[in-house]
């Protein structure tokens, strides 16, 4: 009995000693499988923090400039939006007004806001009030220039080539044309062909628009004066200049000189220097025709007036003289206006210069 009891106790001890070993084996096996699962899943992915945008939106109230009544409200306008973007949204709300005929003012009677101006630059708060004015039917500036310059070219060509249809046939065949008539035709064509080519390939024409009434006024001015000049110069009874060929040759050379200078100045204005502190100020280069920049702020107008003065002396006709006087007055006003802008921006460069005529104007 004692031996049997002892053997039972021995079996119990062996049984209790065997249980932890099997449990440890199972735990090790489970840990191994878990580690294999983690390794096969790959590295843990880091979650990126979501940034909430704090973009400020403006609400623009558009009122009629005359009646002060509300037309519409343009909302959800961002800080980087421009006046052009506001016009686009205004056009969607009111389709009868397309963007080119929309004029927006910050205050009644103030200047119209340019398309490139940002909304943030004119905003005093999140709510902005703008005044709307209908600018009427608009035309692109390239169309305006092409219409104004192509008309004189074709009109003068008609008077020169079809004189028998305009004047008396007997007088046209009786009186031979003076050489200055042919030279005037050549110079006139050179002038307007240059303007047309520069409009298409040289000038950086603004993307803005001009009212239709300005196109009509410009065409009436250029076309009307060209018809008057061409009628007198190509008339069978046209009287040549008083000093003969000497007057014609000198004025023709000066005309071509001014035309060349005008072209080179326009080329410089279209491709300004972008180095130095005067990045936007037009400056002369190695070309002698551009050295007029040392004396005046707007040498292109100076050369233009010089061309028409030379044409007046060459043809010695009243219509050309009147046209030259009117062009001189108009270009002087343009030059003085541009000269004031240059003085505000680049006073150290233009304070000793004249606007259009050296030492005079």
Swiss-Prot record:
PROSITE patterns xref list: S5A_REDUCTASE
One Gene Ontology term, aspect cellular component: membrane
Keyword Endoplasmic reticulum among UniProt keywords: yes
Keywords: Endoplasmic reticulum, Membrane, Oxidoreductase, Phosphoprotein, Transmembrane, Transmembrane helix
InterPro entries according to UniProt: 3-oxo-5_a-steroid_4-DH_C, SRD5A/TECR, TECR-like_N
Membrane spanning stretches: 139-159, 181-201, 215-235, 309-329
GO terms under biological process: lipid metabolic process
Pfam families: Steroid_dh, TECR_N
Membrane topology: Multi-pass membrane protein
Single GO MF descriptor: oxidoreductase activity, acting on the CH-CH group of donors
EC number: 1.3.1.-
Disulfide bond sites: none
List of residues that carry Phosphoserine: 33, 35
Major subcellular site: membrane
Intracellular or extracellular location(s): Membrane; Endoplasmic reticulum
Expression sites by tissue: Expression is highest in the heart with very low to almost undetectable levels in brain, skeletal muscle, stomach, pancreas, liver, kidney, small intestine, and uterus.
Enzyme kind, highest EC tier: oxidoreductase
Assigned protein family: Belongs to the steroid 5-alpha reductase family.
Protein name from the UniProt record: Trans-2,3-enoyl-CoA reductase-like
Organism: Mus musculus
């Amino acid at each position: 009995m004692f031996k049997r009891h002892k053997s039972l106790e021995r079996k119990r001890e062996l049984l209790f000693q065997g249980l932890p070993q099997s449990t440890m084996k199972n735990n090790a096996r489970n840990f191994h499988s878990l580690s294999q699962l983690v390794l096969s899943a790959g590295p843990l992915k880091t979650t990126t923090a979501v940034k909430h945008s704090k973009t400020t939106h403006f609400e623009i109230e558009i009122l009629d400039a005359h009646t002060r009544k509300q037309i519409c409200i343009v909302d959800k306008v961002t800080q980087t939006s421009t006046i052009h973007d506001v016009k686009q949204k205004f056009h969607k709300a009111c389709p009868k007004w397309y963007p080119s005929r929309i004029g927006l003012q910050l205050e009644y009677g103030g200047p119209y806001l340019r398309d490139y101006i940002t909304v943030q630059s004119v905003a005093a708060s999140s709510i902005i009030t703008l005044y709307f004015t209908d600018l009427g039917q608009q035309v692109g500036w390239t169309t305006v220039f092409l219409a104004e310059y192509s008309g004189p070219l074709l009109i003068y060509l008609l008077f020169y080539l079809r004189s028998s249809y305009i004047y008396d046939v007997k007088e046209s065949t009786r009186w031979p044309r003076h050489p200055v008539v042919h030279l005037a035709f050549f110079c006139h064509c050179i002038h307007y062909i240059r303007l047309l080519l520069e409009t298409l390939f040289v000038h950086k024409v603004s993307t803005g628009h001009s009212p239709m009434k300005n196109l009509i006024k410009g065409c009436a001015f250029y076309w009307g004066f060209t018809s008057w000049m061409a009628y007198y110069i190509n008339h069978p009874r046209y009287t040549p200049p008083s000093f003969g060929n000497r007057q014609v040759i000198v004025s023709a050379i000066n005309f071509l000189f001014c035309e060349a200078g005008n072209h080179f100045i326009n080329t410089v204005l279209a491709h300004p220097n972008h180095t130095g502190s005067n990045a936007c100020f037009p400056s002369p280069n190695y070309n002698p025709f551009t050295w007029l920049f040392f004396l005046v702020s707007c040498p292109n107008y100076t050369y233009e007036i010089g061309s028409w003065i030379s044409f007046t002396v060459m043809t010695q006709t009243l219509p050309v003289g009147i046209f030259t006087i009117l062009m001189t007055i108009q270009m002087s006003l343009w030059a003085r206006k541009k000269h004031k802008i240059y003085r505000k921006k680049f006073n150290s460069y233009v304070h000793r210069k004249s606007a259009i005529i050296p030492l005079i104007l």
